[in-house]
């Protein structure tokens, strides 16, 4: 197995692999404040084994029109959902998400970081 991930994500992935024989997708998250929005959400700060970004540009929408801008931050959305399920202060550091048809990838969460030329807050 080729590991291209941060040390905490690598440790979680290797531990799961050694205990179960399966390599699950792993997302490590943290709280994140958002400009122009009240409240915080959890976002992915590391990931392994899962495609962090799902680019749907060029795909047809429900009306058959070609999508022009839809790029979904999958790892961030799953991180936020897991935080809601686990409870922010419940001291539940691990949440298992089932039922999402994820795509495997070894690219990591770096795909979520905005390119400097598109960053509104350099």
Outline where the language-model segments fall.
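A structural signal for small-residue-enriched, beta-sheet-centric alpha/beta enzyme cores
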Residues: 20-122
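Phosphate-interacting basic helix/loop segments used at nucleotide- and nucleic-acid interfaces
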Residues: 6-23
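Nucleotide/pyrophosphate-binding catalytic subdomain
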Residues: 1-5
């Amino acid at each position: 197995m080729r590991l291209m991930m941060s040390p905490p994500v690598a440790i979680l992935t290797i531990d799961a692999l050694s205990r179960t024989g399966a390599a699950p997708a792993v997302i490590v998250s943290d709280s994140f404040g958002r400009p122009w929005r009240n409240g915080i959400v959890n976002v992915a700060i590391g990931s392994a084994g899962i495609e962090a970004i799902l680019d749907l540009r060029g795909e047809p929408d429900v009306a058959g029109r070609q999508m022009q801008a839809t790029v979904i931050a999958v790892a961030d959305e799953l991180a936020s959902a897991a935080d809601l399920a686990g409870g922010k202060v419940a001291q539940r550091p691990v949440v298992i998400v089932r039922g999402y048809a994820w795509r495997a990838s070894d690219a990591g969460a770096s795909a979520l970081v905005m390119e400097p030329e598109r960053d509104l807050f350099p």
